[in-house]
Amino acid sequence: MRFSHFLKYNAVPEWQNHYLDYNELKNLIYTLQTDELKQETPTGDLNDDADSQTPGPIADIESNIAAGEPSSSKRRFTHKLKRKLFGSKTPSGSKRGDSDEKAIDGNNINEETIELDELSPQGKTTSFNKNFIRKKFFESRSSSVSSEGKTLFSSYDTFVTNLSDEKLKVDDFYKRMEAKFYERFDHLINDLEKEGIVTRLNETFNPEIQALPPLREIISGTSETHSSNNPFEIHSSNIDSELRNRFDYSEEEMDEDDDVDVFADTTDNTALLNYSQFNIKSQKKSLLKQTIINLYIDLCQLKSFIELNRMGFSKITKKSDKVLHMNTRQELIESEEFFKDTYIFQHETLSSLNSKIAQLIEFYAVLMGQPGNVDSCKQELKSYLHDHIVWERSNTWKDMLGLSSQNNDIITIEDEAEKLMQEKLQIEYFKYPLPKPINLKFTKIENLAVPKLFFGKRAMKIGFIIIVTGVLLGVKTFNDPVEHRCMALVECCAFLWASEAIPLHITGLLVPLLTVLFRVLKDDDGKVMGAAAASTEILGTMWSSTIMILLAGFTLGEALSQYNVAKVLASWLLALAGTKPRNVLLMAMSVVFFLSMWISNVASPVLTYSLLTPLLDPLDYTSPFAKALVMGVALSADIGGMASPISSPQNIISMQYLKPYGIGWGQFFAVALPTGILSMLCSWALMILTFKIGKTKLEKFKPIRTRFTIKQYFIIIVTIATILLWCVESQIESAFGSSGEIAVIPIVLFFGTGLLSTKDFNTFPWSIVVLAMGGIALGKAVSSSGLLVTIARALQKKIQNDGVFAILCIFGILMLVVGTFVSHTVSAIIIIPLVQEVGDKLSDPKAAPILVFGCALLASCGMGLASSGFPNVTAISMTDKKGNRWLTVGAFISRGVPASLLAFVCVITLGYGISSSVLKGST
C-alpha cells in the first residue's frame, strides 16, 4: 500500500490537518526536480550523482546514458523524465504523475488554546533556528557534491525549510493534545483514589506492560514486536502482495519507499453487560471503566500520531534523496539531528506516554478484579480500541476508497452494488446457433436465445402446477361446474403454498384474483356472481375481524418487548430456576411458552434467546446443555403457538371457525393451556433424556431489578384490559360486535399516544397478514361454491360409522404432516374449513367444534424439521461466539419428530377429553 493512502486510512479523522502533509511535500519534491531539469545541467554530472544513489527508474535511465548511448541520449533522457513528471501515458495505459495523491482536505477543527509555558519542563523547547539548520546541513552536503552548488542549495534549502515547518506544526499540536490528555489522566487518578481502587502514581506497577506495541499492531490484532535498528521501520507481511494488487495504481515503476506493510484482518471484539451492573456500586464502576477505556483509546491514538509522523518524515526524506539526489534522510532523520529541538520525537516523550498507557492497563485490571491477569485485560482494551477505530473511521475509509476508485480500478461497495443492479436488469440466455441465419429488415438472427429462467426449479414447479390446474379445469371432476372450477382453484393454491414456487404471501394475494377469474362465488340464490360483484365480495371478506386481531397481537407484542416489560418479567422467572441445568431448561421453556401466549411465537424465541445470552456465551457448540437449551426454546415456542387465541396465526384463523359454536377465550384457555403445558413437559423430558446436560455447571441467573415507569404500567394495564375484553367478548357482543373491534383499542392507544411509531407499524410481519388474508379468501371461495359441502357429504358416508376420536386422529395426522413439511398457518388454512364441514355433517353436535379445536391445536405440533415454523428457523440460525451453529438438521429430526408425536398424543388424549366435556355443540 502506498504511504499516502496508509497515512489517510490510519490518521485520526479529527486530526487530519495536523499530520505531516506528505502529499504536499511530495509535490514539492517533483516541482524542485522540474526546476532543476529546466536548467542546463551536464549529463555527466547528473550521472555521477545518480550513481551514488539508490537504484530506481531515473538511475536506470542514467546508467544507460553513461554506457554510451547515441548523441540524442540526453534528449531521450529528458523526454522520459518529463513523461514521469507530467503524467504521460504508460505502456499499461494509466496516467503517470501524482494526481491520485492529492492532499487531504481536512475539516476545520476548533482547538483549545493551551499556553506552552504551562507545560511540564520536559515539554518546553526553544524556537527552531531555520538558518542554522540550513547552513549546517548545506555545508555537509555541498562538500560532497560537484559544481551544482547553486541549484542544490536552492532545492535543499526549500525542501528543508518546508520540512521544518511541518515538524513545528506536528510538534505544537502534539504538545497541546498531550497536555489535555494528561490532565484527564490526573483527574482519573483522583477519582480512582476516592474510590480506594488504586494508590498514587509513584506506586510500582507491572513492568511487563511498559513496552507496548505500536497502534498499527493493535489494529491488526497482533501484539508482536519487531526488532530493528529503526523502531519505525516498516516490514512486509504475508498479504503484502494481495493488497498491493488491490491498490494497484498501474505505475510503471513503483518506488520502494512507497511500500509499507499491511495488516491482517481481525475479528470484532464485543463486550456484553451482565446484570450485576445495575446497582449504584456497579454504575460507578462502569463509569470509571468507560473513562479508562476512552483515555486508553485517546493515548493510543496519540502514540499513533508520533509513529505516523516519524514514519512520514523518514519516507519523505527517502523520496527526496532518490529524486533530488540529496542525503537528507541520513543527515537529518537517522542521525536524529532534525528532531533535537522537538518535544514529540524525544525518547522521553514516548517513554512517558507508554508509561501512562501501561498504568491505564494496570488500573483496568484492578477495576475488573483481575490484578493478576494483566495480559488478558490488555487484550480486552485492545479490542475496545480496535472496535472504536473500525466504527470511527468506517465512513472515512469508504469515502477514500470511493474517491480512489474514480481514477483506479478499485472495486468498492458502490461499484459492486452497481454491478449487481446491472446484472439484475439483464436476462441470461441459452443460445443455440441456427443452421441458417434469418435476415430481417433491421436485424439478423443467427442464434435461438432461450431465457435460462425457464429451466430453473421454480419454473418447473410453476409449469407443473399450471399443467395440473389446466387438466383439472378440462376434466370433469364434479357435476356442478362451479364446484369443478373451485376444485382446480384449491389445487392450484395448495400446490403453490406447498411447493413455495412463489412466496407464500404472494400466493395469498393471488387467491382473490383467481377466485374472480375462475368464477367460483355464488350469491344467496345459488347463481354465479359476475366479475364486479365477486371482486367486491372477495376483497371485502379479506379484511376481517381475524386480521384486526392479528394486528392487535403484533401491537401488544411490540409494546411489551420494546419497553422491556416482557424482558423484565422473563428475567425474574429465569432467576427462580436456580443453577441446576434441568431446572434452568424447564424455566427457559416455560418463559418462552408464556411469552408466546401474548407476543406470538414469532417474537418470543428471539426475546428469550437474548435473555439466555449470559448462559450461552461461556459455552461452545459442543455443549449438550447449550444444544438442549436452544432446541428446547424452539420446541416450546412451537407448542406455545397453541396456548392462546393470539399466540399464532393459525389460532387466529381457527377462532373464526370456532366462533359459531360459542367458543370464546375462556373455553379456549380451558382446553389449550393444559394440553400445551403437558406437551411442553414431554418435550422437556425428551431434551433431558437425549442430551447429557447434568455435567454442566451454571451460575445463578440474576433478575433485572428496575422500577416500572408510568409508560410501562400503562402498557401492562392496556394489555390486561384487552385480554379480559377478549375473554368476555360473548357477554359484551352487543357493545363491540366482534373481537376485531376490541382489537382496535390497543392499536389506537399505543400508536395514538406515541408509544409506538409509524416505523414500528411498518416493521410488522405484513407477509403473515397477507397470508392470513389469502387463507380467508380461499375459505370464502370454497364455502361459497359449495365444494366443502359436497366433499363433506362424501366423507360422511365413509366415516359416519367412525367416532369423533378416530376422525380426529385421521385429520390430526394430516395436519401434522402438512404443518411439518409446509407451514403451520397453511395447514390451518386448507384443512380446518374441510374439517368443519365434515363435523357439521356428523350426528354428534359436538363433533364439529371438537374436530376444529383439535386440528387447530395440532397445527402447532409440526416440529420435525428446521424449517417447520419460525421458532425452528430461529433456532437453527443460532451460533456460538466462534460462529458455529448450536444445532444441525439431524438434531432437529432426531428430537423434533419425537416431540411432534408426543404433542400429537397429548392433543388426542388430554385435549380431546377436556374439549368433550367443556365445549358445547352447535345450536
UniProtKB/Swiss-Prot annotation:
Membrane spanning stretches: 462-482, 494-514, 538-558, 584-604, 628-648, 668-688, 708-728, 736-756, 768-788, 803-823, 850-870, 899-919
Residues with attached carbohydrate: 162, 202, 274
Keyword terms of this UniProt record: Glycoprotein, Isopeptide bond, Membrane, Phosphate transport, Transmembrane, Transmembrane helix, Transport, Ubl conjugation
Residue spans, topological domain Extracellular: 1-461, 515-537, 605-627, 689-707, 757-767, 824-849, 920-923
GO MF entry, a single one: phosphate transmembrane transporter activity
GO biological process per UniProt: phosphate ion transport; plasma membrane selenite transport; polyphosphate metabolic process; regulation of phosphate transmembrane transport; transmembrane transport
Boundaries of every SPX domain copy: 1-334
InterPro entries: Cit_transptr-like_dom, SPX_dom
Membrane topology of the entry: Multi-pass membrane protein
A Gene Ontology cellular-component term: plasma membrane
Bias-annotated ranges (Basic and acidic residues): 95-104
Locations listed in the record: Membrane
Intervals, Cytoplasmic compartment: 483-493, 559-583, 649-667, 729-735, 789-802, 871-898
Region (Disordered) location: 40-74, 86-107
Per UniProt, location of the Glycyl lysine isopeptide (Lys-Gly) (interchain with G-Cter in ubiquitin) cross-link in this chain: 102
Domain of life: Eukaryota
Family label: Belongs to the CitM (TC 2.A.11) transporter family.
General remark: Present with 504 molecules/cell in log phase SD medium.
Protein's job: Involved in the uptake of inorganic phosphate.
Protein known as: Inorganic phosphate transporter PHO87
